[in-house]
Amino acid sequence: MVEPITAEEFRAAPGVEGWEAGATEASTTFRTASFATGVALINRIAALAEEANHHPDVDLRYATLTVRLSTHEIGALTARDADLAGRISAAARDLGVD
């Protein structure tokens, strides 16, 4: 079984700067500057999610992309969320998205 982590443990993980964490979910919003850039980031997120078999909720608007992570099977944050958040943030940086 997957073990939950606290919001503090999530925030201490590498690469998750800019993410907000609560008891059951972590989220961030990226400013993408264009819809096409947002779609490109979603494609990167999709590949990372498939690789990790861990799938975030994403909400793309014209120039923003909001990503929410939670381990639904236990209704809490886990190390899987922190790891994927760090990978998503790295993908955003690679695309020049903040």
Regions found by a protein language model. Give the residues of each.
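Charge-rich alpha-helical segments
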Residues: 1-98
